[in-house]
Amino acid sequence: MNPLAQPVIYSTIFAGTLITALSSHWFFTWVGLEMNMLAFIPVLTKKMNPRSTEAAIKYFLTQATASMILLMAILFNNMLSGQWTMTNTTNQYSSLMIMMAMAMKLGMAPFHFWVPEVTQGTPLTSGLLLLTWQKLAPISIMYQISPSLNVSLLLTLSILSIMAGSWGGLNQTQLRKILAYSSITHMGWMMAVLPYNPNMTILNLTIYIILTTTAFLLLNLNSSTTTLLLSRTWNKLTWLTPLIPSTLLSLGGLPPLTGFLPKWAIIEEFTKNNSLIIPTIMATITLLNLYFYLRLIYSTSITLLPMSNNVKMKWQFEHTKPTPFLPTLIALTTLLLPISPFMLMIL
């Protein structure tokens, strides 16, 4: 990517997300989504090769299809109600079409097939933006129209997403695909609680972004893209050996780490609404995520690649990449649970 074009591209992505998140008019919301989508394609093709080009085409086709469905739903709602305001989305069919479009943009099941492929075909930094920043605009739309959502359909999509994300990651060896399937599972949890408590979705999204950002930065620091390459962590960067497992366990939602907080709060929210079966199913299926996280932890902390003695301590002399935000992110990833009563009180 041309260095001169980078500020324009990233500022357009930021502006598109901001327009969508702050707008209450359907037309400007759609324009913001389109700005965001078109500006993000060069980010996916940062390294020009056939795999990244294929990933960009898959991303464009999926997002363009979702945008067409969204535009059709907006026009249909305007024909029936004469309103462009997002809070006046009262027509049932328009609401269903908007939900389908946002499910495609978020990568929820059964529209999730593009997420692992696109994430795998891009560099780690582009994959990080795809799985974090690109979720903000669709979730802001879902947040604004949450009173008019079809609860049964949304819960069905959420459970399907949790199932697809948990089972899809079981036989993977590529770290980017594993994190993509983890993202699908987290999307299921976020959308499940949206009709009951939209603010809980925002809390879940915030913690998800912190955890995923930490995981991607650690893997990028280690230059690891497969489970086999994780085995060289001890020889290459020994100080990462305890950090990667703790981050992965937090992503899996294991107490007493930060990742347990959103799951605990969501299960409590369902219990308050006298719904016990759905959170039980969600929590049980999500346990499969812990299995493939434990596989990664095994590769990181227990398995060692065969290396000669003269390079075993090479990490002491390597010039590591600057990581100004990593200590703060690691602290938030592991130590946020004790202040959870304060956070839940705000909600």
Swiss-Prot record:
Pfam families from the UniProt entry: NADH_dehy_S2_C (PF06444), Proton_antipo_M (PF00361)
SUBUNIT field: Core subunit of respiratory chain NADH dehydrogenase (Complex I) which is composed of 45 different subunits. Interacts with TMEM242.
Transmembrane annotation, as ranges: 13-33, 56-76, 96-116, 123-143, 149-169, 178-198, 201-221, 247-267, 274-294, 326-346
Effect noted on mutating L71P: In LS; uncertain significance; decrease in enzyme activity and impaired assembly of complex I
Catalytic activity: a ubiquinone + NADH + 5 H(+)(in) = a ubiquinol + NAD(+) + 4 H(+)(out)
Protein name as catalogued: NADH-ubiquinone oxidoreductase chain 2
Reported effect, N150D: In LHON; secondary mutation; does not seem to directly cause the disease
